[in-house]
Amino acid sequence: MEMKNMVVGLFLIAAFALPALATNFEKDFITHETVQAILKKVGPSSNGMLDEQTISALTGKTIISNPVLEEALLTHSNSINALGGTLPCGESCVWIPCISSVVGCSCKSKVCYKNSLA
């Protein structure tokens, strides 16, 4: 009986802890430089006001500035993108689409890449 209680307890812990843990690992991010590029591109045409959808998307992403994380993403993008492999937009698109589409980026393999034709 004691073993059964331990197994049930383990399943209860897993049921509540694992979904919260998974959401921390798959959060979208955006770099400070990308936010600045978006604001520079959008700002003058709209008198400094962003639309509600853009504000919601920006607040849903985690701003990063860690050079180690950026270097890891650059290394990872080299293996995915055989045509260039640079860190083009500094943004992920796991859950939220590329906000940097304003500056010519699109989503590929959960990372926003710059369209070379734009």
UniProtKB/Swiss-Prot annotation:
Propeptide span(s): 23-84, 116-118
Signal peptide per UniProt: 1-22
Tissue: Expressed in leaves, petals, petioles and roots but not in runners (at protein level).
Disulphide linkage map: 89-105, 93-107, 98-112
InterPro entries: Cyclotide, Cyclotide_bracelet_CS, Cyclotide_sf
Keyword Disulfide bond attached: yes
Modifications after synthesis and translation: Cycloviolacin-O8 is a cyclic peptide.
Swiss-Prot/TrEMBL GO biological process terms: defense response
UniProt KW Disulfide bond keyword: yes
Keywords associated with the record: Disulfide bond, Knottin, Plant defense, Signal
Covalent link Cyclopeptide (Gly-Asn), residues: 85-115
Function text: Probably participates in a plant defense mechanism.
UniProt comment concerning the protein's domains: The presence of a 'disulfide through disulfide knot' structurally defines this protein as a knottin.
Family the UniProt entry places it in: Belongs to the cyclotide family. Bracelet subfamily.
Protein name, entry field: Cycloviolacin-O8
Organism ancestry: Eukaryota, Viridiplantae, Streptophyta, Embryophyta, Tracheophyta
Gene (UniProt): Voc1
